[in-house]
């Protein structure tokens, strides 16, 4: 499977942000992108279909990104999935919390395609080791 065939799930309660992330991924050559508007919907999609990568916002109603991450890491079928946390929160304690919960990476909004590309490459490299 080529890296461009990676199946992404973009999770954010703000549709504009989902569209921005989708467009940035498209710029980077990733066209297989689905969306969910919160952690509850994301978890249902992850359990019903096959995805290779999750890009999730932190602050969402119903189930936050960190709760989604914890659910993914606790699920035997999903725990291998890389999860990139996207948030407006640049607080050190949030970065530490995300790392402790098993986030594969962390990016602060707003960000560019180059920043996203750099984070994704780091995660893909660590997956291939």
Task: Please describe what each predicted stretch is.
Residues 44, 66-79:
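Short amphipathic alpha-helix used as the core "switch/output" element in two-component signaling
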Residues 60:
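Receiver (REC) domain active-site loop signature in two-component systems and cognate sites
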Residues 49-55:
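Active-site beta3 strand of CheY-like receiver
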Residues 15-34:
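Two-component/phosphorelay signaling modules centered on CheY-like receiver
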Residues 35-44, 65:
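Helix N-cap/capping motif at the beta->alpha junctions
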Residues 111-120:
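C-terminal output helix
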Residues 22, 67, 90-105:
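Alpha4 helix (beta4-alpha4-beta5 surface) of REC/receiver domains from two-component response regulators
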